[in-house]
Structures are given as C-alpha cells and as structure tokens.
From Swiss-Prot:
GO terms for biological process: methionine metabolic process; one-carbon metabolic process; S-adenosylmethionine biosynthetic process. It catalyses: L-methionine + ATP + H2O = S-adenosyl-L-methionine + phosphate + diphosphate. It comes from Schizosaccharomyces pombe (strain 972 / ATCC 24843) (Fission yeast). It comes from the Eukaryota. The lineage of its organism: Eukaryota, Fungi, Dikarya, Ascomycota, Taphrinomycotina. This is S-adenosylmethionine synthase. GO terms for cellular component: cytosol; nucleus. Mg(2+) binds at residue 10. The keyword Metal-binding applies. Its cofactor is Mg(2+); K(+). Keywords: ATP-binding, Magnesium, Metal-binding, Nucleotide-binding, One-carbon metabolism, Potassium, Transferase.
Amino acid sequence: MAQTFLFTSESVGEGHPDKICDQISDAILDACLKDDPFSKVACETASKTGMVMVFGEITTRSQIDYQKVIRNTIKSIGYDDSEKGFDYKTCNVLVAIEQQSPDIAQGLHYEKALEELGAGDQGIMFGYATDETPEKLPLTILLAHKLNAAMSVARRDGSLPWLRPDTKTQVTIEYEEENGAVIPRRVDTIVVSAQHADSISTEDLRSEILEKIIKPTVPAHLLDEKTVYHIQPSGRFVVGGPQGDAGLTGRKIIVDTYGGWGAHGGGAFSGKDYSKVDRSAAYAARWIAKSLVAAGLARRCLVQLSYAIGVAEPLSIFVNTYGTSSKTSAELVEIIRKNFDLRPGVLVKSLKLQTPFYLSTASYGHFTDQSKPWEQPKELKF
C-alpha cells in the first residue's frame, strides 16, 4: 500500500490587510522603476483603520506622488467606501521615506558595470518546484490562490455583489508518496472565509460560495463525499481589511511562495528592488528548481542560494531532489553553475527585473503567473 499523507496550504485575497501592504509597497516600487530603472527601493507599509503609513529608504530619479500611488492601489483592491471598513478617498496617508544609506550604497559598487553589482545584503534564499501540476507548483497552494482569485472575480463582475475584498482560503490535500515525488489524490478539506456585506445571511453565503466559487474552481475528480467544507466557520465576517486587523508588508511570505512546501529563507519580497537578493535570488532559485524539473532531471527539487553584502557571486548552492533524480547533488550543482549566472547584476537582465511588473506579483503568489521570466524554464546544457 502506497504511503499517503495530508498537507495543507493557505492563501489570502487582495483585501487582506497584510496583502494590501504588500501591494502598496510594490506599487511604489513600480512607480520608481517606471522612470528610473536603477531606483533603489526598500519600502515598507503598515495599515490600520483609516490609516496607511509607508516608510523606508528610496533613492530614485522618478518623481513619485506617494498619495496618488497609495490611494489608487487601495481603490483598485476595492476599498472604496467606508461601509466596507476602508476608503481610499478618506484614509489618512503618512509617508516617512529617506534615501538609501550611503554605507550600503558604497558597499554595492554602483560605479562598476552592472554585472559586478554586489548583493544588497547577506541572506539565504530557497526555490522549489514539483511535477504535480503543469505550473510545477504544489497543488495545495495553487488551489488556495485560485479560490481567492475566483472570489475577487465574482466580487468585481457582480455575480457575488455582497463579497468584500478581505478573503482567506486553506486547502488540505491527501497525497501519495512515490519514490520521493508527491501525487495529489483528493482534496480532504477546504476552508473559506470571506468578508461580506451585512445584507447576506450566513446560510446563503455558504451555499453561494460552495456552488459559485469552490465547485467551478476545484477539479471535480478531486472532490468526493468525504471532502470537508468549512465555509465561513466563524459565522459573521463584516468587519475586515485593516479595520479588522493591522496590516504589514512581508507578513505573508509563505502565501507568496510555496505554501509551506520546500523551505523559506525568511526574506520578504514586496517593496524591494532587484539589488535586494531576498527577492531577486529567491526568483532565481525558483527559476533553477523549475528548470531542473522541466528538464526531467528531478520530479521535486529544492534549491538554496546564499549571498554576502557587496559580493556578487553566491557563496553556496545546495540542491535536494528528495530521491527523485538519477544524478547526485554534486552533479546537479555543477549543472546549475554551468547554466546559470547568479550574480544579481546578471539576474537583473536574465529575469528582466528592471520591469515595473511587481504589483502583479503581490497577490496570489509570486510564482503563479506563468508569463513571468522566472517561470519560463531555461533549456539546460548537460
């Protein structure tokens, strides 16, 4: 009998307070990069009832209207009325932005060629890929994202007009292990919580989310009579967004990545330009892991990179294929070294990291949009 186990991942919608902050930080990063691709940005956001504060270090030639960028982001998320607990028109916006520290700037060698740009800090970054879905992402996190995205669509197109932007989902899948690879067999449990208008009853909300969100989103063959649904387990959820909880950039790093699979080095992504290896090298590690799986070199793969401030080359490369590769870890590391130049100033070019596309990564995961450069597997020579 094959060994089975349950694994769970969660995701949150655009209106979750922490995700609002991620999106504001990345909207500011995009605004900086739009007119100055060499902008240096480290932008944090905090939010609570009726208030947003952005703070950090930004060095850019772009003229940024922070008020406008922040309010437009909140508006596009859907908080456009105080009845929803937050309103882009009336919220208080505080800005405490300074220039990048000259000590950090001199350590990164901006005066040299871009290829020789030193890493913006020390740190460890991980990338993960698995052959269980075409996207090479764990199905648990993929379905959790898709459920939140479906609620966003239903809220915007009017099919579920009582929905509000703050949503949360969690998906538990029963997996079978096969020589280190994992195969999803069925969905065991689905949890959905959604902020809603006062006008809808909990009973109606539960049946509408089951019929209009869960059933069209989750493949029918994965649902069975044993699947458990916890829809709005708290009952009411009218007070949401920053009114319900304080929000902070960088508090949803597992939602942003692999839903608990693989590993995480601890560095958040949003609000950071490409010189911050927390972001650029984590994208590169994902690119490597996905390329190895796509090339048939492994069915599951975890890659670790590490850097030191001011040093361009990674200090170490580690690969774990969970016993799914015919090659040794040392052979795979050699393949990585031959195929990938992992200096931050080269990653900028190979992954197009000066493009102002970061706001689009700040909700529903950084590895779900298959058009992004790090999601295009590289053809490997080995």
